[in-house]
From Swiss-Prot:
MF GO annotations: rRNA binding; structural constituent of ribosome
Leader sequence segment: none
Record gene name: rpsH
Family matches, as HAMAP family: Ribosomal_uS8_B
Keywords: Ribonucleoprotein, Ribosomal protein, RNA-binding, rRNA-binding
Protein name: Small ribosomal subunit protein uS8
Subunit structure: Part of the 30S ribosomal subunit. Contacts proteins S5 and S12.
Source organism of this protein record: Petrotoga mobilis (strain DSM 10674 / SJ95)
Function: One of the primary rRNA binding proteins, it binds directly to 16S rRNA central domain where it helps coordinate assembly of the platform of the 30S subunit.
NCBIfam families listed in its UniProt record: PRK00136.1
Length: 134
């Protein structure tokens, strides 16, 4: 059992991305689904699919690359966990970070659900910074 399931998901995606895997399987949860939905909407992954295994389920994530077969590069250059179980990071509306000068996204868990930094600024809500993706 992992102490931080979201960090485990991000690590699995980062590792699969670095060896150019087509897909990666992750134990499912609603928070992970919300994070993957944002990553899909922002164009960092191709798609994800829920597979019912009779227990908690599995999320199969289809990764996205740019370039031809020979010089393939991951679309997602980096992904890091910000708020950890030992050190939670909360921000208000004025302190929502911009990732890589606006080229990346910060994913936040707010009172209105999981959303990107841009959406949180528009809705004027703060929350817990889950991760940065660029």
């Amino acid at each position: 059992m992992w102490s931080d399931p979201v960090a485990d998901m991000l690590t699995r995606i980062r590792n699969a991305n670095s060896v150019f895997k087509e897909s990666v399987e992750i134990p499912a949860s609603n928070l992970k689904k919300d994070i993957l939905e944002i990553m899909k909407k922002e164009g960092f992954i191709n798609d994800y699919k829920f597979i019912d295994d009779g227990k908690q389920g599995i999320l199969k994530v289809y990764l996205k690359y740019k370039g031809t077969r020979r010089d393939k590069k991951p679309i997602m250059e980096g992904i890091i966990r910000v708020s950890k179980s030992g050190r939670r990071v909360y921000v208000n509306t004025r302190n929502i970070p911009k990732v890589k000068g606006g080229l990346g996204i910060a994913i936040l868990s707010t009172s209105q659900g999981v959303m990107t930094d841009k959406e949180a600024r528009e809705k004027k809500v703060g929350g817990e910074v889950i991760c940065y993706v660029w």
